[in-house]
Each structure stands twice: as C-alpha cells, then as structure tokens.
C-alpha cells in the first residue's frame, strides 16, 4: 500500500487494528473483511468519502499451522473466511463502484496454492481457492473490471530474517522483499496492464520451477 500511496493513489487501508506505521497519506479504516456487515460498511464509507473505487487489493491473510487432527473446524473456518471468503465479500460489495471506474482487482495468494508443507491444509486450500476465484471473477466482471492474482513465495520480513543458504536456494539468488510484490501490484493496478486479466503471477525467485533432488 505504501507503493500505491507513493505513486499518488488515494489509499484506504482496511484492517482489524490500526497498523503501527501506516503509509503516509493513507487512510485507515477498521474492518473485519471476513464479516459481511463490516465489509458493507467499508465500501459504503469509501463510496461516501471518495466517490469512486479504481483498484481493490485483497491481501488479508492468516495461517494456523496444526496437524489436521488438531485443527478445529472453527480454526479452519477462520482461515478460509479471512483468506478466501473476504475477497468474495469485498468484490461483491464493490462491484458497482469497480465497474463504473473500469477498475482492477488484485488478489494476493501464495505459492502454497501450488506446493505444500505439512500441516498447512487450511492455508493451502484458501490460497488455491483464491487463485480459482480470481480467474472466475475475471470472466464474470469482464469487460469492465480486470482481475489478477499475485502468488508470492518467501518474502522476508523483520520477524523472519533469511540466512545465506536461504538466499542461495533461490534461482534469483535472494529471498523476496515486500517491494517485489508492491511493484507488481502497482503495475497490475495501472493502465499499463490493461490487456492482462485472469492471470496468476508467481513471485518466488524461481523456486517453484526448481528441480529438487534428495541430498
């Protein structure tokens, strides 16, 4: 979102809690994107305050990693609700605004939609569903709205610093950084990507294409 704000977009961030360091110029609105009434209030507020909605970026995501026998239905539903159902609710509520603006939707999935680790069933299912939802929406909202998906791999954060071996494992020679995803999001939001819709972009430094052999 900081990239979009820097590029001159009027940015509204929806979050359950106010971010510690929101991007300069962005407006933060409290919203539970897995809750239908909360999403309706968010979009109604954008309509009133901004009068239009050009781009919707759906990047809410959580993960609960447990063995399947220990994963409760409530935990499963929480992950699916936040990672998948939220995008359905947001697009449904914003459809009229997006069609009027000839806008764009960018969803943020994950390479876990294509490759898995143990005990990630809810997360993998939600992200795989989001990829499918993206191309379905691209057809349903055409020709007024473009819908595309970004599937990041390992994106380094302050709480998860990569080691030298982690960088070397990636064909690109490094682990991803938030700016890698932000740059593609900005491109898909703008007019330069006007002939792109229904696509999934894998941003993982080449890892999903790498053959891995037993040591």
PLM feature spans:
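Residue(s) in the substrate-gating loop at a strand-loop-helix junction
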Residues: 110
């Amino acid at each position: 979102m900081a990239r979009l704000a820097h590029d001159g977009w009027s940015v509204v961030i929806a979050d359950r809690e106010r971010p510690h360091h929101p991007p300069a110029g962005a407006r933060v609105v409290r919203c539970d994107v897995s809750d239908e009434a909360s999403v309706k209030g968010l979009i109604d507020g954008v309509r009133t305050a901004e009068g239009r909605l050009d781009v919707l970026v759906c990047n809410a995501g959580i993960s609960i990693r447990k063995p399947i026998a220990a994963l409760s239905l409530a935990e499963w539903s929480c992950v699916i609700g936040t990672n998948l159902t939220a995008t359905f609710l947001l697009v449904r509520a914003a459809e009229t605004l997006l069609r009027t603006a000839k806008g764009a939707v960018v969803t943020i999935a994950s390479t876990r939609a294509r490759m898995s680790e143990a005990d990630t069933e809810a997360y993998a299912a939600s992200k795989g569903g989001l990829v499918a939802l993206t191309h379905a929406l691209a057809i349903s909202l055409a020709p007024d709205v473009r819908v595309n998906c970004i599937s990041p791999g390992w994106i380094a954060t302050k709480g998860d610093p990569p080691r030298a071996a982690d960088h070397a494992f990636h064909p690109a020679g490094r682990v991803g950084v938030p700016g890698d995803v932000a740059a593609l999001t900005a491109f898909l939001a703008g007019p330069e990507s006007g002939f792109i819709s229904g696509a999934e972009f894998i941003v993982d430094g080449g890892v999903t294409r790498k053959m891995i052999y037993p040591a």
